[in-house]
Amino acid sequence: MTQPNNYKIGTNVIHAGQSADKNTGAVIVPISLSTTFLQPSPGVLHSEYDYSRSGNPTRKAFEECIAACENAKYALSFASGLATLTTITHLLKSGDEVISIDDVYGGTRRYFTRVAANFDLKFSFVDLSTLDDLKNAFTDKTRLVWIETPTNPLLKVADIKAVADYVHSRGATLVVDNTFMSPYFQNPLDLGADIVMHSVTKYINGHSDCVMGVLATNNDELYAKLKFLQNSIGAVPSPFDCFLALRGLKTLHVRMEAHQKNAFAICNFLEKHPKVERVIYPGLPSHPQHEICKRQMKGYGGMVVFFVKGSIDQSRSFLENIKLFALAESLGGVESLIELPSVMTHASVPAEERAKLGISDTLIRLSVGIEDINDLLADISQALDKC
């Protein structure tokens, strides 16, 4: 369990869960690659570790750091964001029902509908920008509510506190995927969520060189169940990946401010461009849930969505002519990324569902990096001129 402290997140990302190595004095947490640990006598542990799937010193340091950043008692890390999702889903039993926000990451929807549904779990996808659809979807069998806020890719925002209050009144558990905001800009546990999770691959690691996931909670019972599942399922990250994530985490506060600064500048440019139909960003007053954003977030992040005028031909032309923005899936790295969700991250979502959600062929998603803003704006401008 992580002990609470009074430090700000900019201090916790550097120090929480970490101390100088007792043997060498090294100020950086070592990469503990050993798969097994010495027992001085049969069944007697030399330390808290016996086998690296069950527990690892490098992994523990990362988990304690995340817990401190999310104002949580506990954190558990996994081999990917989807491994985190899979482990959480194992809290359920046959016949249980799950409500998910409709505009959810394509991989999450794919797992829910094409994998977990085969184990007699029922999933419904609803718009959670208001509580009406949530209340209508709830049944006596609803055990879990899963939200992303902001969502991927349309950046819709749910009122975490309002959702948590209703979910708890019905005896269910609320999970919030906080990947887009990171612990720096949003802390869902403080707003009533039972579990917060992240794809560490994104902003927490921040360097596009590590695939990992993590969850945090303040609930003792949930932690005990999830810790058992972490060990039993075994979808744990390698010590080296934990080291990379811990290293990336140290600059989270600096990076997130830079992402946000560049995102605002790009939004201001796009809103005035004649070839852009619409811009979506939580920090813009035009965002439908901007007031909720101001209430529950400390900032607005680096994800920007905009619609080009025309058809998929204009989208393809723009994306083929962009230079600094890498045309690639994923997000949250220091480098700027760009993608077309309808044929990339959300291609697994049926076309009729994409149309219903508003994920059109002219919707372009930006993961705004921390490069020089003038270079990024010049790149966007020249690509738009050619589409």
Curated annotation (Swiss-Prot):
Residues modified to N6-(pyridoxal phosphate)lysine: 202
- EC class: lyase
Species per Swiss-Prot/TrEMBL record: Dictyostelium discoideum
Q: Where is this gene product found? A: Cytoplasm
Q: What keyword terms does UniProt attach to this protein?
A: Amino-acid biosynthesis, Cysteine biosynthesis, Cytoplasm, Lyase, Pyridoxal phosphate
Tell me the function of this protein: Catalyzes the last step in the trans-sulfuration pathway from L-methionine to L-cysteine in a pyridoxal-5'-phosphate (PLP)-dependent manner, which consists on cleaving the L,L-cystathionine molecule into L-cysteine, ammonia and 2-oxobutanoate. Part of the L-cysteine derived from the trans-sulfuration pathway is utilized for biosynthesis of the ubiquitous antioxidant glutathione.
Name the UniProt record assigns to this protein: Cystathionine gamma-lyase
Residues the entry annotates as binding substrate: 53, 105, 110, 329
Q: What is its EC number?
A: 4.4.1.1, 4.4.1.2
Instruction: Tell me what gene encodes this.
Output: cysA
Protein origin, superkingdom: Eukaryota
| Pathway(s) served | Amino-acid biosynthesis; L-cysteine biosynthesis; L-cysteine from L-homocysteine and L-serine: step 2/2
Q: What is the lineage of its organism?
A: Eukaryota, Amoebozoa, Evosea, Eumycetozoa, Dictyostelia
The coenzyme or cofactor needed here is: pyridoxal 5'-phosphate
Q: Which Gene3D superfamilies did the record assign?
A: Aspartate Aminotransferase, domain 1 (3.90.1150.10), Type I PLP-dependent aspartate aminotransferase-like (Major domain) (3.40.640.10)
Would the keyword Cell division turn up in this protein's UniProt record? no
Q: Name one GO cellular component term.
A: cytoplasm
Report the CDD domains cross-referenced here. CGS_like
> What catalytic reaction does the record list?
L,L-cystathionine + H2O = 2-oxobutanoate + L-cysteine + NH4(+); L-cysteine + H2O = hydrogen sulfide + pyruvate + NH4(+) + H(+); L-homocysteine + H2O = 2-oxobutanoate + hydrogen sulfide + NH4(+) + H(+); L-homoserine = 2-oxobutanoate + NH4(+)
Q: Which family does it belong to?
A: Belongs to the trans-sulfuration enzymes family.
What GO terms in the biological process aspect are recorded for it?
A: cysteine biosynthetic process via cystathionine; cysteine metabolic process; transsulfuration
Q: How does it assemble?
A: Homotetramer. Interacts with CALM in a calcium-dependent manner.
Example GO molecular function term?
cystathionine gamma-lyase activity
